[in-house]
Swiss-Prot record:
The lineage of its organism: Bacteria, Pseudomonadati, Pseudomonadota, Gammaproteobacteria, Enterobacterales. This is Ribosomal protein uL3 glutamine methyltransferase. Specifically methylates large ribosomal subunit protein uL3 on 'Gln-150'. InterPro entries: DNA_methylase_N6_adenine_CS, HemK-like, Ribosome_uL3_MTase, SAM-dependent_MTases_sf, Small_mtfrase_dom. Pfam families: MTS. Belongs to the protein N5-glutamine methyltransferase family. PrmB subfamily. It catalyses: L-glutaminyl-[ribosomal protein uL3] + S-adenosyl-L-methionine = N(5)-methyl-L-glutaminyl-[ribosomal protein uL3] + S-adenosyl-L-homocysteine + H(+).
Amino acid sequence: MDKIFVDEAVSELHTIQDMLRWAVSRFSAANIWYGHGTDNPWDEAVQLVLPSLYLPLDIPEDMRTARLTSSEKHRIVERVIRRINERIPVAYLTNKAWFCGHEFYVDERVLVPRSPIGELINNHFAGLISQQPKYILDMCTGSGCIAIACAYAFPDAEVDAVDISPDALAVAEHNIEEHGLIHHVTPIRSDLFRDLPKVQYDLIVTNPPYVDAEDMSDLPNEYRHEPELGLASGTDGLKLTRRILGNAPDYLSDDGVLICEVGNSMVHLMEQYPDVPFTWLEFDNGGDGVFMLTKAQLLAAREHFNIYKD
């Protein structure tokens, strides 16, 4: 978009609604990729325009006719242009993302929250756990969104948020503090289970890197802005998942449960381990590639994964 185009937008667009409509039109024409919390140009525009004005997403309808200052319009137009030209996810432009109804700070040190596990958390893992968990582990926590959402869902639980990346943990720590959960959620740096004490968790939730080599080579440009450490996991996408399966039973209580997301790599997991009784979970709000295993099932499958123990 050249300067004339920008000047036209700033001079002829006046209200929040004008900016929303213009952003939707620009996004639709640019054929950008959605997948970082939205799946359509309208939601993408809302999540860019309103946070750029320091407004909540659910402003009253009549507020959309509010007029904007020149500096506000320039800020929005600049971000729309960067979203299109540089293919930067909106969450990195606004430093805001939402998960389980909660707002989180994000930047390019962490993945943008989007896991279908959020639906399970909102439902308090109904039908998957036998009792309220007292100790929860969020492995590969990234921004800390899963750990923090679990702390809200289970306010009496202690939650450990583990990641190998100090950059990611810095973001997680910021979010933990912003949500006032420093006494409930503990950030821990560890290479998966390697540096963890042998705590017996009632629930281990993990959204590890799981993108296989083929998919990594073909990712839309938007995903190139995310840390590769949070995406790639070997040729078949299961490098880290195997280690998790090998170590998880030692860290689960007797009635403990592992919930793990592997995305498209579920195909490789089912092909390679047909005898393991993965329970593949279904979602009302879209998403797949998330399985559940109990401690007993993990112990029974140990012959497959013992080689990957730390």
